[in-house]
Amino acid sequence: MGGGLIERYVAAMVLSAAGDTLGYFNGKWEFIRDGETIHQQLAQMGDLEAIDVARWRVSDDTVMHLATAEALMEAGQSPDLPRLYSLLAKHYRDCMGDMDGRAPGGACMQNAMLLQPNRADGYRIPFNSHEGGCGAAMRAMCIGLRFPHPSQLDLLIQVSIESGRMTHHHPTGYLGSLASALFTAYAVNGKSPWQWGKGLMEVLPEAKKYITQSGYFVKENLQHWSYFEKEWEKYLELRGILDGNSAPVFPQPFGVKERDQFYIDVSYSGWGGSSGHDAPMIAYDALLAAGDSWKELAHRAFFHGGDSDSTAAIAGCWWGVMYGFKGVNPANYEKLEYRQRLEEAGRALYSLGSKEDPVLDP
């Protein structure tokens, strides 16, 4: 573990945005479907260490992650959940005004504009069988910074699901939000990444119970529930970590080309990382292989032929919680867009998350 916990909270927010920025490259790399082409261009630039992000913009992922963080900050200590949800809805809707040149996803754009934060239950949208994308997963990591304590697991489940289904009311979408938040909390607690996947599988029945109890489009949600769970179980079996005790096993070779194919194989429609199940999965796969190497994390999670900025935003956050800024060239984040807001969010979330405060549920 690198640095004190405050520094690692700051690194979580900043390096998530750095990953997003690097994977996006002002829109040039997110949509290149061939990872080898990206890696060739990266090598011509002098590789990761040589990149100064001064003129590189964050994408929609970071704008929405900041929206989540700043809603949590505004809700303050011991918030009541309806107010927190209204604040999340407000921040999601408002941040749509900052999407020019950031390639926002369709579901996020359309549904955020439907949210009515000032009305009771105005944060709810109907179920939609086409909303399994990664837009909920890419913005939820900081929920795990806010509610990291094991005693707050039920809260983390509820807040990640409800924040996720404000734009992605489909289990494949909002369970990605749960995975992003849960793994962040695991990182805060120093839980070995080998155990994270097993932990997620144990939490999914609790999430299902919450969906049933919430009484909102229950039948539709349960009908579409199994895909996320089955895909994750298949992945954990493939890496040999379903038991939570074993070291992950990677194929040999597993270079850029092989990883691109693997990311296609785990995807829903052929664009790796673009769904709620595979964006955190690819980020997790990269983290397991990279250990404390920022460069190795980047090569696996930021620079590939899939939805690279989303997998990068998620992986960068988890890695930052674990290792702080250890071995990261300051040029990768010093002149980052919104760096001050990101640092402030990290410090504020540390202050809020360090106390096991109760949350008022009506």
UniProtKB/Swiss-Prot annotation:
Asked if Disulfide bond is a keyword of the record, the answer is no
Where does the chain bind Mg(2+) 2?
A: D307, D309, S310
InterPro entries recorded for this chain? ADP-ribosylarg_hydro, ADP-ribosylglycohydrolase, Ribosyl_crysJ1, Ribosyl_crysJ1_sf
EC main class here is: hydrolase
Q: What are its E.C. numbers?
A: 3.2.2.19
Q: How is the cofactor bound?
A: Binds 2 magnesium ions per subunit.
Q: Which residues bind substrate?
A: K90, S129, G135
Which GO biological-process labels does this protein carry?
protein de-ADP-ribosylation; protein modification process
State the GO CC annotations: extracellular space
Residues that, per the record, bind Mg(2+) 1: S59, D60, D61, D309
Q: How does it assemble?
A: Monomer.
Outline what the protein does. Specifically acts as an arginine mono-ADP-ribosylhydrolase by mediating the removal of mono-ADP-ribose attached to arginine residues on proteins.
Give the regulation of activity: Synergistically stimulated by magnesium and dithiothreitol (DTT) in vitro.
Q: Which GO terms describe its molecular function?
A: ADP-ribosylarginine hydrolase activity; magnesium ion binding; potassium ion binding
Name assigned to this protein? ADP-ribosylhydrolase ARH1
Q: Where is this region: Substrate?
A: 106-108, 168-170, 268-270, 274-275
Q: Kindly state which keywords UniProt assigns to this record, in alphabetical order.
A: Hydrolase, Magnesium, Metal-binding
**Any stretches that span the bilayer, and where are they?**
none
Q: Which PANTHER family match?
A: ADP-RIBOSYLGLYCOHYDROLASE, ADP-RIBOSYLHYDROLASE ARH1
As recorded in Swiss-Prot or TrEMBL, the protein's gene is named Adprh
Q: Which reaction does it catalyse?
A: N(omega)-(ADP-D-ribosyl)-L-arginyl-[protein] + H2O = ADP-D-ribose + L-arginyl-[protein]; alpha-NAD(+) + H2O = ADP-D-ribose + nicotinamide + H(+)
Names of required cofactors: Mg(2+)
State the similarity comment: Belongs to the ADP-ribosylglycohydrolase family.
Claim: Magnesium is one of the keywords in the record: yes
User: Which Pfam families does the UniProt entry name for this protein?
Assistant: ADP_ribosyl_GH
